[in-house]
Structure formats: structure tokens, C-alpha cells
């Protein structure tokens, strides 16, 4: 397993459309690396393969307090959603910036688990929001895309400042 570099906006690799995984067995190391990378962050709850420069349609999520209950979603799709509300989001690829985004509070997601078994997850509240956020990455979308141009500029200023501080 390896901790991978998390890309930050405006890296063009974050905008790449993910490719469907056809052989789940072939991506087990990537799944492990995504989980290890997620667990190395201070406050991350989800990570998508494009955030580490990979094109596979894979998302990992762990909302548990002890970070020991990973949810692995391969080729996930939101098939339905209801009850939109505004809620604050952040992103490991847009560090140090948080903003209100409108999302469904209840969703149905279909995916494969890490063993290739079909999943259909009906969930609400925070997990529903995180799933939508991470699945957006698979289409090359960031949460700041839902914001006004002014707020997008503010977000990018924060990211540039974060990257300068990190480079020191």
C-alpha cells in the first residue's frame, strides 16, 4: 500500500471523466492505496480516484470515528435523489475552502463493492452528501463548480495560498 499525492485544483487531471472498471480484481491495490491516502489526511471522509490522478471510477468513504469502516464504491451512480438542501462542503482537492452547496439529502446509489458484488444503497443526510460529492469527482466536477464565479475565484485564491505554504 502507498500514500498517494492528492491533486489540488486547478490540476487538469481533476477534470478527467473516469473510466468504468471492468475488472475489479485488477484495482485492489488502487483501492488499498486510496484508503491509506484517505486515512493519512486530517479530516477527509472520502476520496475519489481522480483526486490522485487515476481514471478508474472508484470512490472510498469512511465516516466512522475510528476510521475503520470503509465503504468502497466501484462504478457508482446516483440513480435517484430527493429533498435538496444547502449544506457546507469542503474538499481535499480544494484545501482550506468551505462553501454551501445544494445537494439531495436522500439518494439511491448503485455500485459494485471491492469484491465486484452489486450494491444498491439508499441513504440520507451526511452519507448521501458525501456520496454525491465523491461521485461528482468521477465526472470531473468539483464542489466549487456549483458556486458563483466570485466564490470560485475566492476558492482558487485559498488553494494557491495553501499550495504556496505547503511548498515551503
UniProtKB/Swiss-Prot annotation:
Its EC number is 3.5.1.88. The keyword Metal-binding applies. Binds 1 Fe(2+) ion. Keywords: Hydrolase, Iron, Metal-binding, Protein biosynthesis. GO terms for biological process: co-translational protein modification; translation. SUPFAM superfamilies: Peptide deformylase (SSF56420). One of its GO terms (molecular function) is peptide deformylase activity. The keyword Iron applies. Its cofactor is Fe(2+). It catalyses: N-terminal N-formyl-L-methionyl-[peptide] + H2O = N-terminal L-methionyl-[peptide] + formate. The active site is at residue 134. Fe cation binds at residues 91, 133, 137. Disulfide bonds: none annotated. Gene3D superfamilies: Peptide deformylase. Belongs to the polypeptide deformylase family. Removes the formyl group from the N-terminal Met of newly synthesized proteins. Requires at least a dipeptide for an efficient rate of reaction. N-terminal L-methionine is a prerequisite for activity but the enzyme has broad specificity at other positions. This is Peptide deformylase 1. The gene is def1.
Amino acid at each position: 500500500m502507498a500514500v498517494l499525492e492528492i491533486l489540488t485544483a486547478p490540476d487538469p487531471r481533476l477534470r478527467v471523466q473516469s473510466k468504468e472498471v471492468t475488472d475489479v480484481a485488477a484495482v485492489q491495490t488502487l483501492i488499498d492505496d486510496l484508503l491509506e491516502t484517505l486515512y493519512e489526511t486530517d479530516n477527509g471522509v472520502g476520496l475519489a480516484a481522480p483526486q490522485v490522478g487515476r481514471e478508474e471510477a472508484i470512490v472510498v468513504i469512511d465516516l466512522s470515528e475510528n476510521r475503520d469502516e470503509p465503504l468502497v464504491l466501484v462504478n457508482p451512480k446516483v440513480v435517484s435523489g430527493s429533498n435538496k438542501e444547502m449544506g457546507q462542503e469542503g474538499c481535499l482537492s480544494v484545501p482550506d475552502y468551505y462553501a454551501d452547496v445544494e445537494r439531495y439529502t436522500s439518494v439511491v446509489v448503485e455500485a459494485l463493492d471491492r469484491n465486484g458484488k452489486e450494491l444498491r444503497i439508499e441513504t440520507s443526510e451526511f452519507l448521501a452528501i458525501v456520496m454525491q460529492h465523491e461521485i461528482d469527482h468521477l465526472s470531473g466536477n468539483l464542489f466549487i463548480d456549483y458556486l458563483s464565479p466570485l466564490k470560485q475565484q475566492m476558492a482558487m485564491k485559498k488553494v494557491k495560498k495553501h499550495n504556496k505554504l505547503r511548498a515551503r
